C-alpha cells in the first residue's frame, strides 16, 4: 500500500515539475518584455515606489501550488494547445480552388478528342462463337422412326445501330449519356463516363407540342433527364393528347434459333432477355429435338433525342480536363460515345416451338406470324397444331400480358394487338437507343460477327413394299436398297440390302410384303416378265431407281406376255 502511495506522489511530482517548467518559461518571456518597456519609460517612473519582482511572486505562488498539489488526490491534466491553420494559408487554398474552377479546358478537350486515333468498326467489333468441331450428321433410331440430324456451319454479320435496352443499363443509356466504345458496349453493358457537364437540350417527338417539346436540362444526369422526360410526357397527356393520335411505328423481325450468339445478332437483342423470359432450350435445339422461332415486335410510342454537339467539348463543363476523362477510361481503345436518342414504347417477344421434324416448320411459323390463314395448308396446319407459343410483353401495361403460354396462336395475335395505343394506363418503356462517337457524331453500330451451327432434323418413318403379280407370265424381281447410318464423326455409313427372292421366278398370282427400315434410301425396284420370244426372252415391266420411302409402296404387274403392264403407287 505504501508503494502505491509513493508511486502516486512521485507521479504528482513529475507532473508538477513539468508544469513549473512551463510556468518558468512564461515568466522569463514576461521579464524580457518588461525590460524593454522599462527602457522606453525610464524618465516617467523615477518618482514611483519600487514594486516587488514579478518572478519572485510567481515563484512563491508556484511553490504554494506545488505543495497543494502534492497533498491533493486530484489528477493533473495537461491539455495540448491546438495551433490553428494560418488565415493566409486558408486564403491561398481558396484562391487555388477558385482558379482551378475558372480555368477553361475547352480547347484542350477538343484537341485531345479530335486527335484520338481509332477504327469505328474495330473498337465496336463483337466476335461471337467460333465453330471448330461439330458432327455434321447424326442418325437416331426411335421405334419405327429414323431421325437424321444435320448440322451446317454458318456465319452472320450484322451492324445494328439501335441497341436493345435492358433494365440493368437504363441509368447509362438515357438521352445525352456519355459512354465508352469498348467491349462492354458491344455486350450491352456500357460503361458510363460521369463528370461535370454543360446544360443539355432534349426533344420529345410527341405530336402537337411544338416548341414545348424541347427543354434544357441544366445538369444532364440520369435522374435529371428522366425527370425532364416525365414532365414532358405529363404535359402532353394534360394538354395535347386529346386531339392527337400517335403514328404507328412498329418494327418486326423474326428468326429461327440455332445458338445464343446467332439469335443475338439476328434480332439485335441480348440473349439473356430471351432466355430469361421465354425459356429457350438451346440444348434441345442443338440436338435437333426442337425447332424454335423468335419474333420481336417493337412498337415505338415516342423518341427522345439529345441535341448533337458541334464540338466534343460542348458537352463538358469548362473545368473538365482530358486527364480526368483518361482516368475514367477514355482512350484510343475506348473513345467516348454520346447517346443521341432513346426510343420508348413496348416490345413483344413471341416464341414458336415445335418438336416437328418437318422441313416446312420455318415456313409455317412465318405464315402464322404474318397472319396467313394456315388452315387451308394441311402441312402448315399439322405443324402448328403440334406447336406451343409463348408471348412476353416488356413495357406498356405489361401486367395484363406479362407472359402468355398457349397452344392457340390467335391468343398471341390478340396480345400483339392489345394495348397498342399510348396512354397513362399504358406507359412507354425504354426499348432501344442509338449512340454516336463524340469525335464526329458518327453512329456507333456494333459489328456483330459470329459463327453458328444450323441444325435441321428430318424424320423418316419405316415403310414397306407390297408386291402383287397378276400377269399371264412368269415374273422375276430385283429389289435393292441402302440402309444409312452415321459414325461418331458424322460420316455416312451405307449398308447394301437386297430382297432374298431376287431373280426367283414367280407365277401368277403372287404377292408378298417387304419391310423397309426408316433409314432405307436409294430404293430400286425392277420387275421383268418372260415373253417366250427367242430374241427377247425377258422384258422389263418396271425399272425404277430412287423410289422414295413411303408408308406403303405398292408394286403391281399384270397383263400378258406381249402386253405387260406395271405400276408403282404410294400410300
UniProtKB/Swiss-Prot annotation:
Subcellular location: Secreted; Host cell membrane
Biased composition range(s): Basic and acidic residues: 50-68, 79-108
Signal peptide: 1-33
Region (Disordered), start-end ranges: 30-108
Transmembrane segments: 260-273, 280-289, 358-367, 375-387
Keywords: Cytolysis, Hemolysis, Host cell membrane, Host membrane, Lipid-binding, Membrane, Secreted, Signal, Toxin, Transmembrane, Transmembrane beta strand, Virulence
GO cellular component term of the entry, any: extracellular region
InterPro entries: Thiol_cytolys_C, Thiol_cytolys_C_sf, Thiol_cytolysin, Thiol_cytolysin_ab_sf, Thiol_cytolysin_sf
Entry coiled-coil feature ranges: none
Annotated Pfam families: Thiol_cytolys_C, Thiol_cytolysin
GO MF annotation terms: cholesterol binding; toxin activity
Membrane protein topology class: Multi-pass membrane protein
Protein's name according to its UniProt entry: Streptolysin O
Keyword Cytoplasm: no
Chain location of the short sequence motif Cholesterol binding per the record: 561-562
Role description: A cholesterol-dependent toxin that causes cytolysis by forming pores in cholesterol containing host membranes. After binding to target membranes, the protein undergoes a major conformation change, leading to its insertion in the host membrane and formation of an oligomeric pore complex. Cholesterol is required for binding to host membranes, membrane insertion and pore formation; cholesterol binding is mediated by a Thr-Leu pair in the C-terminus. Can be reversibly inactivated by oxidation.
Amino acid at each position: 500500500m505504501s508503494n502505491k502511495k509513493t508511486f502516486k506522489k512521485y507521479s504528482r511530482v513529475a507532473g508538477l515539475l513539468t508544469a513549473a517548467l512551463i510556468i518558468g518559461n512564461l515568466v522569463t518571456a514576461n521579464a524580457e518584455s518588461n525590460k524593454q518597456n522599462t527602457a522606453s519609460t525610464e524618465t516617467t517612473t523615477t518618482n514611483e515606489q519600487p514594486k516587488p519582482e514579478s518572478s519572485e511572486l510567481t515563484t512563491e505562488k508556484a511553490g504554494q501550488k506545488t505543495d497543494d498539489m502534492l497533498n491533493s488526490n486530484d489528477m493533473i491534466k495537461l491539455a495540448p494547445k491546438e495551433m490553428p491553420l494560418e488565415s493566409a494559408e486558408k486564403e491561398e487554398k481558396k484562391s487555388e480552388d477558385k482558379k482551378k474552377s475558372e480555368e477553361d479546358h475547352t480547347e484542350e478537350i477538343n484537341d485531345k478528342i479530335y486527335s484520338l486515333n481509332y477504327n469505328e468498326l474495330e473498337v465496336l467489333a463483337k466476335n461471337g462463337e467460333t465453330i471448330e468441331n461439330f458432327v455434321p450428321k447424326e442418325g437416331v433410331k426411335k421405334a419405327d422412326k429414323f431421325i437424321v440430324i444435320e448440322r451446317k456451319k454458318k456465319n452472320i454479320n450484322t451492324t445494328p445501330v439501335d441497341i436493345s435496352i435492358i433494365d440493368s443499363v437504363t441509368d447509362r443509356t438515357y438521352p445525352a449519356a456519355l459512354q465508352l466504345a469498348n467491349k462492354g458496349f458491344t455486350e450491352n453493358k456500357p460503361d458510363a463516363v460521369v463528370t461535370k457537364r454543360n446544360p443539355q437540350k432534349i426533344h420529345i417527338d410527341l405530336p402537337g407540342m411544338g416548341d414545348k417539346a424541347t427543354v434544357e436540362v441544366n445538369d444532364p444526369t440520369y435522374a435529371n433527364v428522366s425527370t425532364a422526360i416525365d414532365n414532358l410526357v405529363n404535359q402532353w397527356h394534360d394538354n395535347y393528347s386529346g386531339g392527337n393520335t400517335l403514328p404507328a411505328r412498329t418494327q418486326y423481325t423474326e428468326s429461327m434459333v440455332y445458338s445464343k450468339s446467332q439469335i443475338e445478332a439476328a434480332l439485335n437483342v441480348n440473349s439473356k432477355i430471351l432466355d430469361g423470359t421465354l425459356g429457350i432450350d438451346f440444348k434441345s435445339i442443338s440436338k435437333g429435338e426442337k425447332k424454335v422461332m423468335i419474333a420481336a415486335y417493337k412498337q415505338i410510342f415516342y423518341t427522345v433525342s439529345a441535341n448533337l454537339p458541334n464540338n466534343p467539348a460542348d458537352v463538358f463543363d469548362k473545368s473538365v480536363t482530358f486527364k480526368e476523362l483518361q482516368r475514367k477510361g477514355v482512350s484510343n481503345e475506348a473513345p467516348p460515345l454520346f447517346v443521341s436518342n432513346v426510343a420508348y414504347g413496348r416490345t413483344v417477344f413471341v416464341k414458336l416451338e415445335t418438336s416437328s421434324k418437318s422441313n416446312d416448320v420455318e415456313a409455317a411459323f412465318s405464315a402464322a406470324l404474318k397472319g396467313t390463314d394456315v388452315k387451308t395448308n394441311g402441312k402448315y396446319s399439322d405443324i402448328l397444331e403440334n406447336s406451343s407459343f409463348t408471348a412476353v410483353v416488356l413495357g406498356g401495361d405489361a401486367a395484363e400480358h406479362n407472359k402468355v403460354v398457349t397452344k392457340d396462336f390467335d391468343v398471341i395475335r390478340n396480345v400483339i394487338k392489345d394495348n397498342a395505343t399510348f396512354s397513362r394506363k399504358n406507359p412507354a418503356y425504354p426499348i432501344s437507343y442509338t449512340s454516336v462517337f463524340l469525335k464526329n457524331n458518327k453512329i456507333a453500330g456494333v459489328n456483330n460477327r459470329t459463327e453458328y451451327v444450323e441444325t435441321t432434323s428430318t424424320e423418316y418413318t419405316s415403310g414397306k413394299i407390297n408386291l402383287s403379280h397378276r400377269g399371264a407370265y412368269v415374273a422375276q424381281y430385283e429389289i435393292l436398297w441402302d440402309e444409312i447410318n452415321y459414325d461418331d464423326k458424322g460420316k455416312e455409313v451405307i449398308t447394301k440390302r437386297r430382297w432374298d427372292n431376287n431373280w426367283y421366278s414367280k407365277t401368277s398370282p403372287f404377292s408378298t410384303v417387304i419391310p423397309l427400315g426408316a433409314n432405307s434410301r436409294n430404293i430400286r425396284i425392277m420387275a421383268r416378265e418372260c415373253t417366250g420370244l427367242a430374241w427377247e426372252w425377258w422384258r422389263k415391266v418396271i425399272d425404277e431407281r430412287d423410289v422414295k420411302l413411303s408408308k406403303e409402296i405398292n408394286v403391281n404387274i399384270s397383263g400378258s406376255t406381249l402386253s405387260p403392264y406395271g405400276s408403282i403407287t404410294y400410300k
